[in-house]
Amino acid sequence: HGRKAGVRVTFSPSPFYTPEVDEFCKKYVYQKTVDAMAAEGRPFKGIIFFGLMLTADGPKVLEYNARFGDPEAQVVLPRMENDIIEVMEACVDGKLDQIDLKFEDNAAVCVVLASDGYPVKYEKGIPIHGFENFKDKDGYYCFHAGTKFKDGEIVTNGGRVLGITAKGETLKEARKNAYAATEWISFANKYMRHDIGKAIDEA
């Protein structure tokens, strides 16, 4: 047990999201949600993030967000081959059925670098170093979250500071690459989880 906090590690594709889970969710979660909003006179057009937990009794919905998941999008979007602008325009125009979403045949893992003490009490305004290490590194990404530009440098400004994403041919390789890339960034109170995502090594 612990305090509720934002996601610290995420990966794509998920070996736990099986065809059976997908079929169940499409029938009883995704479509039901959209149909219910339309029936209430509030048809939804946009992004819905479904926060799911897999249980012995099947998938359970923990939360909805009317946006991409953070940091979930940081492993999904880098693998998407489509132009995201075209996808969003199709969404706005009601023509998503004409879009064939395609994803790279690889994997991506994102490790969140947090401020030590998060989600309770943590220091802000600490200089962050190492962004130059990501230059010209294909398949590696550094996504900003709790940061700001102050006095000519980038400093921490939140609990979840950066999302470090890396690709790999497999989830195991992507996880290894992502954790290696976390060492490229340094700030005084940097903290990250090492135990989350280990299940993908055996998946």
Question: What is the predicted function of each stretch?
Answer:
Residues 1-3, 50-54, 59-68, 146-147:
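Short beta-strand elements
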Residues 1-21, 71-76:
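Glycine-rich phosphate-binding loop of ATP-grasp-fold ATP-dependent ligases
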Residues 26-48, 65-137, 150:
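Active-site "cap" helix and flanking loop/linker of ATP-utilizing ligase/carboxylase catalytic domains
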Residues 59-60, 108-111, 139-141, 153, ...:
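Structural motif
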Residues 147-151, 155-203:
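Generic C-terminus detector
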